[in-house]
Each structure stands twice: as C-alpha cells, then as structure tokens.
Amino acid sequence: MENIEGKEEQILIRITGQDRPGLTAAVMGILARYNARILDIGQADIHSTLSLGILIRIDDMHSGQVMKELLFKAEELNVNIGFAPISDDEYESWVDHQGKNRYILTVIGRSLSAKQIAAATKIIAEQGLNIDFIRRMTGRMSIKYPERNVRACIEFSLRGTPKDRELMQSKLMHLASEQEIDFSFQRDDMYRRMRRLICFDMDSTLIQTECIDELAARAGVGDKVKAITERAMRGEIDFKESFTERVALLKGLDVSVMQDIAEHMPITEGADRLMSVLKRCGYKIAILSGGFTFFGEQLRRRYGIDYVYANELEIDENGKLTGRYVGDIVDGKRKAELLKLIAQVEQVNLAQTIAVGDGANDLPMIAEAGLGIAFHAKPRVKATAQQSINNIGLDGVLYFLGFKDSYLGEQGKL
C-alpha cells in the first residue's frame, strides 16, 4: 500500500488468547501493509495461552484502518485484542529508562509455592525494583509422576537499583532459611552468560565427606583430629598449624587405605549433571582444595577436570604415610591466588570466573570470583557469600549461570 506522509503516532497492541501457529504472522502481515515500524515487541506462552505485546509507530492517517483490520483478524482468530496510544513524551521517558541497572533474581527449591514467590516479590517491591519478565528455568512439572519433579527454578529479570542492597541480601537469606529455597541476586551484564572458569572446593562440596576425617578414622585417630579441627574453628590455631598437626597423626597409614577411600567417595548430588554440562559447554574446571591431591586426581579422571591444586601427602618407600606433606599448603589465601593465576593462564577475565565452596577457607576465592557461591555452607560462609545453595544439589549452579532445562536436552537430565 502506498504510504502518504503524515503525523506519526505510537500504539501499543495487546493480544491474549489461545496460541496457534501463524497468529503472529497474521498480525504482522496487517502491520506490514501499512509500513508500521516495530518499536518494541514481547511474547509469552503459558500452557498454550498467548500474551503478545507490540509497540508500533505508524502514520496517524492509517492507524484507524489498522486497528479495524486487527479487530476483524482477532475475531477470526478468536483472541482478545486491545489498543493503547502512547504519547511522544511517554515513549521518550521509556527510552530514557533503558540505561537503568538490570539484575537477575533466581529462586530455586525442591518445589516452589505461591507463598514463597509472594515473599520474594515483596522484597523486590520494597527495594523499588521493577520486574521486566519472569521465566521458568526447570522442566514442566508432572502431576501424574511427582517423583520426576526433583527441582523447581524461576528467574526474575529486574530493572532499577536496590534501595539498600545489604538489607535486601539479609532479607533474602532469612527467607531462604525460613522457606527452604535458594536465591541468587546478580547483575545482568555481559559476563553473566560468558563465564568460562569454575573453581570448586572438594571436600563437602564435590564430595560429601572430609577426606582427612576418613583417613583419621582408618588410622584410629578420629577423635584427636576432630579435637584439632574444633580448636582451629575456635581460632585457637590457624589453618596451617592445624593441618600440620592433623597430617602428623596419619603417620604409618598404608596408601592402599587412601585408594579404598578414593574409590568409594560419596559424590555430591547433582555433581555428575553439572560436570557433564560444564564440559560440554567448554568451561575450564579446577579443584582448589585444602584436602589432598590423591583424591582430587580421582575426580580429575572421573570428570576430565583441567586443574587440581591440593595438598600432597608424603609417602615413604614402603607405601606408608610419613605424617608430613610436600610443598606449600593450599589454604584460603592460596586458593584465591590460584583462581587468579588460572584465569590469567586461560586468558579469562575475573568477572568470568566462578568459585564454589562450603568452608571459611573458601571465602577468599568466593570473594575474588565474578560469581561466588556458598554450597551447603557453614553459617559464616553463608552470611558472607552473595549467592548460596543449601536446599538442592550442586547442579543448582547451572540455573545461576542462566541455563534452562530445555537447553540441556538428554545430557542435562538426571
């Protein structure tokens, strides 16, 4: 159709109803005939129910005819349609707000209820943040086979700046503990979907045990090692001193005991799924552990891990532990240094790094990483880390990275 120049106006078109193939194409076909320009568009489909919004700019000489044709087409397609004029000032105000900060709030649990979401969105509102869109990250929930529903995750895209981020984080942590759900609140920038290096603690993170406790139990010194650990936790001795004392108690233990423990290490829920996806997507993976390389190497072989840095136990010519270690101790400070070193070697920006751990020794690397996650962590670590997972498995990390179950296909299933 020939376009006769005139004054232009903005019209917001809203369409709801039963979705079907070709509906959007039919609407766009009408708009195309009148040379309408698309200023904004968004569509959502929930249980085959469509919600489509289109903001157009069109010559006001044609706007009446366009709306008339769209009304007839909506009736033909059995959908609801509405129109709202948008003034130039309103439109420009909307454009000016596009530079506002964006954040992503991820909510994860074994299941999610209206009560939990109501509490989370109340905190969002109190902080003056606006929800741009909401999407489900996990697969569809079966009513017939509830045992298949192992986790639920919803992601909120938010716009604005929190009035008090520290207070918001505190309220989210309290809600997480009270409602048995997990949260991640992070800036939605280009690095969020471009993470490239992930560093894990090993004991009580990738595996559900503390290897030094297993070794101590086999050596018959479990109570002594536990007492030293408790002294360290009270701050009576530092990590290096406590580590040296505990290793000394393992003197004489046969290396075959280590092999037996390594072969039967309990793998953390979700670790297999997480590692499969990370390797498939090209992530570099590191273990940075205050534990022992012997067990880290077992995990390297299992998952194809790229880097393992842990503590080396000295073994004598008879295959017995000497009660000493070789090289420098990997403590919290060293973990943070190693994260930065590996990032440099791999030419990865620190904003593209992830650190996951449970203990106080993990806090330095969690703080250093672009995304630091406390996993089933000690209270002090949970209180310090910006993101935490306490109620589901290790594969919950995937949702913090923006993965949807629908992206993962068969390899992403349990």
Label every model-predicted segment:
Residues 23-24, 116, 206-209, 362-365:
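Short glycine/serine/threonine-rich phosphate/pyrophosphate-binding segments
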Residues 25, 29, 68, 72, ...:
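Solvent-exposed alpha-helical segments within well-ordered globular domains of core cellular machineries
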Residues 31, 190, 194-240:
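Active-site neighborhood of HAD-like aspartate-dependent phosphohydrolases
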Residues 252-414:
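C-terminal cap/substrate-recognition subdomain and adjoining C-terminal extension
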